[in-house]
Amino acid sequence: ILASNDYTAIPFTVTETAAVKAGYPMTLAGKKAVAAGETGSKTINADGILLYDVDPAENPNASLLIRGVIDTKKAAASSSFTYDADAIKALKTAVPGIFCRDNISVNA
């Protein structure tokens, strides 16, 4: 999901009952973030983006991306989270250190 080698991630624990795929926005409580609101004014309760796939039944330890550049096409394909314009705008407000790109032909 990364589009750059320069990023910051913090350790945290996934508390979901099922596996969560890389690229999904997460809360510090270890839950999947939820986007809410009307088109054009959505908000999201995200604190970062899950850096790697995590199955909490096997090992709940994870890395939460809090600063860096992500390839939204890769993140969406991995996580099934919808990275539309409203979600990206809400994510940038919630986690200002995350930059979303989708026009990347070669990743670092």
Where do the protein language model's features map onto the residues?
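Surface-exposed, low-hydrophobicity beta-strand/loop segments enriched in small/polar/acidic residues
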Residues: 1-108
